Structures are given as C-alpha cells and as structure tokens.
Amino acid sequence: MDQHQLDEENQRAALFHSSAPSSSLGADGEEERETVPLLSCKMADDKSDTVQVSEDTAHQISIDPWYQVGFILTTGVNSAYVLGYSASIMVPLGWIGGTCGLILAAAISMYANALLAHLHEVGGKRHIRYRDLAGHIYGRKMYSLTWALQYVNLFMINTGLIILAGQALKAIYVLFRDDGVLKLPYCIALSGFVCALFAFGIPYLSALRIWLGLSTVFSLIYIMIAFVMSLRDGITTPAKDYTIPGSHSDRIFTTIGAVANLVFAYNTGMLPEIQATIRPPVVKNMEKALWFQFTVGSLPLYAVTFMGYWAYGSSTSSYLLNSVKGPIWIKTVANLSAFLQTVIALHIFASPMYEFLDTRFGSGHGGPFAIHNIMFRVGVRGGYLTVNTLVAAMLPFLGDFMSLTGALSTFPLTFVLANHMYLTVKQNKMSIFRKCWHWLNVVGFSCLSVAAAVAAVRLITVDYSTYHLFADM
C-alpha cells in the first residue's frame, strides 16, 4: 500500500471515530452531548459556525458513463406518467398554451438543471446529495430544509408511480373481466408489493444497468402503441372537442395546476444524486446527459402527449391507454409494459431515500447481496414502500399528486433553489443584468410555487369530496 492509500485509510479511520458522540460542558455546568455524523468537510452556518458535509455513502459513485446517466434521466421523463400528460397538461391549457408550455418548460428546466450541474464541485469537492450542496452554501438549516423538500418530492413521485402501476394492472384485468371484482386499491397494493421485490434485489442506482435498457424498451412499447392507436382513433373520429372544460374559476385553478405539471414532467428533484454516479469530468459529462434528456429523450413525451390530445380532445383519459380502442392483446402488451417500466422508474426516484437508509442504518459490512444486507433491505425498504402504497391506495388522484409535487418541491428545488444557489456562489463574477435575471427567477418561481400549491390542494379537496378513501377510479 503506497503513501497515498495510507493517507486515505487514515482519513476514513478519522471519519469513523468522529461519528462517536462527543461531550462538553454547557454554561450551566451540565454535560451536553452532541452526535457528530460521518462527515468530511466543513461549511459555514448562519452563525459562522462550521457544519460538515457528508461524503460517506453505502452506494457506488463516480462509475457510470454519461450515456447511462442520460438513460436514467430519460427513463424518468418517459415513465408511464407521459400517458397522463394529454389530460393533465393539454386539456387545461389547450393547443396553444399546452404546446408553448411544454417547449418553454423544457427550456427553463434545461437551464435550471445546467445551473445545478455546474455547482456539483463547489468548494473543490463533490456534493453527492442535494442537501449536502445546499448545506455547504447556506448552512445547517437549509441542509435540513432541502432534505425535507426532496423527501416530499420523491415520496409523492413514488406515490404517483404506484398509482400508475395499479391503473395499468386494473386496465389489464378489465380487458378480460370487467366485473368490478378487482378494485383499484387491490391493484395498487399488488403494485407496491412488486416494487418492493424489485427494490430488495437492486442495491443501488448504478446497479440498474441492464434494467435501464429494458426500461427504454418498455417505454417505447407503450408509447408507440398509444401513439399508433390514438392516431387510428383520431382518423376514424373526426369530430373532436378541444374546449377547455370547467367554469371560469375552475379554469384558473386547473391552469395553475397544469403549469405545475409542466415542470413536473421534466425534472427529477434529485439531480446531484444522479450526477454523483457519473464519471469525471462530472460537469461536462452531466451536460451531455442533460442535452440527451432534453433533445432525443423528450421526443417520445411530445409524440404521445400531442397525439393523445389530438385524438380525444378534452375527453382524454388521465391514463391514455384507457381511451384507446383496439385489439385486446395489443392493449394488454401496452399496459404490461407500462407496469414494468413503472417498477423500474420508481426505483430511480426512491434511490436517494434508499441511499440515506442504507448509509445511516445499514451494517456497512459484506457485499450488497450478503444475507444480512438483503434482510436489511427487506425490512427498511419494505417499510418505506408500504407507507407509499398505503397513501397511493387511500388517495388515488394521480393528476392532483402531479400538481402538488410540482408545487411543493419541483418549483422550489429545481428553479428557486438552483437559481439562488448559483447567484450566491457566482455573484462576484456576475454582471448586474445576470444578478437581476436570477433574482427574477427566484421571486417569480416562488410565487408560482405558492399559487400552484393552493391550486393543487383545491383540486385534491374537490376530488376527495367527489370520491372517498380507497376509491375505485
């Protein structure tokens, strides 16, 4: 072992010992105990104290090529959520608003994510978690707030994905036996169980590998089937109604909710965690992955969203495959592909929580497939997904969850925080014009976030009064 390796081992040992509780005497003479986590570099907090940023992780980092990360991002963009964008984006906004909104949302999302990617190595080190980056720039309070926002974001995305998987299973059942015996909550419970089985076997994000290829195949299958069958239905049904439904007040709230859905469509809320897996040079490679996502990777989203709205107009179902007509076996293949792709996509969005649980509470010994590590995943990840599944079954309002996710977390994480962090770090190198531009983004998206949250809560309240807990929708 050379001197460099010895130094690294000594640093790891120092980090391990620093995680033990430390004691000190307070002003009143009583002993105060403070637990210092496994951390490695320091940052200033609000009181000019020091807070440390973690580099310790139970998952693999810095090993993936840019195109694998590009496929991870594309998998998120083209998840089964795309089957709902005709209804959740185009119906409330119409042709002009929906088309311009999708293009504009893609542009501003690409810009905001590029800003975030350029902050990955602030301070001469990699920040492998969003909360670590926020903590390094702002301090301990923002570290905790960012983690809370991100947790809400990913929890609601995963809840929506489990609802989608349940809808796909129910759609398959209805194709063969439309007797009302198998309810949506049962399908959601079964979907959560399958997602848990997948989570037990895939230890970390980088281990997806071949599954990303399969995810792409599944996405292309259900998108192509939905596209072709919608095209056929649109040709055979020339009379279509594109009128934006609802009263004047309803349209205001649904329009705001649709704006939240626009930003939800393109953003993960976990870019630093995804960037952590990429090989150096991390900024350059991440830019390649982002360009892939927002060009080639977004084409399927546009195709199925526009075609679904063109074919069915304002009567488009919130799950497009419920609107299409055609042979049972083709619709079965499409729904099964949507179900399987959703299982893989959920693992991507759940990976930051898995990483936190594995790093914080895992044994840290043995390989990822050692019996004790597998049993740990069964207990911890199984418990997390059980809560996700319960919420999904209780409130299966998919479009509302998309709006609320965009409002509460996608806007703050991707647009407000990214612009303000970039402004804070680079302000000495910026012109007055650029500073004003970033402040405009911060204030504007903050206002949109509040408005979208109000609209989403109203939509959920309306749906809750119309339906009931564990509704069979």
From Swiss-Prot:
Protein name as catalogued: Proline transporter 1
Phylogenetic classification of the source organism: Eukaryota, Viridiplantae, Streptophyta, Embryophyta, Tracheophyta
Naturally occurring in which organism (per UniProt): Oryza sativa subsp. japonica (Rice)
InterPro entries listed in its UniProt record: AA_transpt_TM
Record flagged with keyword Cell membrane: yes
Gene Ontology annotations of biological process type: amino acid transmembrane transport
Main location: membrane
TM ranges: 65-85, 88-108, 145-165, 188-208, 210-230, 252-272, 290-310, 333-353, 378-398, 401-421, 437-457
Gene: PROT1
Membrane-protein topology: Multi-pass membrane protein
Region (Disordered): 1-31
Expression tissues: Expressed in roots, leaf blades and sheaths, stems and young panicle.
Record-linked Pfam families: Aa_trans
Biased composition (Basic and acidic residues): 1-11
Entry keyword set: Amino-acid transport, Cell membrane, Membrane, Transmembrane, Transmembrane helix, Transport
Family classification: Belongs to the amino acid/polyamine transporter 2 family. Amino acid/auxin permease (AAAP) (TC 2.A.18.3) subfamily.
Compartments (UniProt record): Cell membrane
Single annotated GO MF: amino acid transmembrane transporter activity
Protein purpose: Proline transporter that mediates proline transport across the plasma membrane when expressed in a heterologous system (Xenopus oocytes).
Keyword Ribonucleoprotein in record: no
